[in-house]
Amino acid sequence: MPKYEIMTILDPKAEMAIIDNLLKTVFGDNSTEKLRKLETTNLAYSIRKSKIAQYFLVDLNAPTNLIEEFVRRANITREIWRYLIVNLDSEKGLNKKPKIRERNRKYTLRRDRFDKPNFRGNPKSRFDQQDQQATKNQQNFQQNQQNQASQYRENSRQNQDDFQQVSSNQQNFGQNQQNQSGYHRENNRHNQENMHQNNKNHQNQTSQTQRNRRQYQPIKNPKFNQKEKENYNNKKPQSSN
């Protein structure tokens, strides 16, 4: 049967009987023999607006199904804020100390973090470092100059393309204006010619109508002589019987 170590964090106002009754209900009466309260009361972070709590630790042997039942009951118990279950057969418990590592040929002692490393294997003079820094700065400056020049050329090319596009648009606009002006002038000329022709036709038609009226109108004026009257009557078309 696997061995477990269970640590629970309870509300600081809760009683020890809560965890005691829970362990007896799930694991039996003998499960609380190794139950003890830890001295630690501070929390790493606030739980339910509280920075202190009660810590309880217990070691026991139990099957997996009882551990699941304990988890279920602990989740529905309001006074139990947190819990941690450790399988001692596969993991290290909270009270166990780590074993001292055996030193062998493959193990080297780790350097203390306060010890300064030794960088004297390849010492360099201050002048060499300055020369290297100056060379690096010069390379960076040249690289920046090249980048700026390439960027300036790219911007100039883009501006030239934009200017050509604007000029082309202006030319197209002027051409369209000229085409529209010529089209309007041509339409106006055709309209004027048509209007003049219509007026001329109307005048001709009016003149012809007036002549026809004068030609076929009977003479009623007594000033005309008899000869003119006969000539007029002879010109008048005879109606067929």
UniProtKB/Swiss-Prot annotation:
Keywords: Ribonucleoprotein, Ribosomal protein, RNA-binding, rRNA-binding. Residues 97-241 are annotated as: Disordered. Residues 130-151, 161-182, 194-210 have a biased composition (Low complexity). GO terms for biological process: translation. One of its GO terms (cellular component) is ribonucleoprotein complex. Belongs to the bacterial ribosomal protein bS6 family. Binds together with bS18 to 16S ribosomal RNA. Signal peptide: none annotated. GO terms for molecular function: rRNA binding; structural constituent of ribosome. Coiled coil: none annotated. Residues 97-108 have a biased composition (Basic residues). The gene is rpsF. HAMAP family: Ribosomal_bS6. Residues 109-118, 183-193 have a biased composition (Basic and acidic residues). This is Small ribosomal subunit protein bS6.
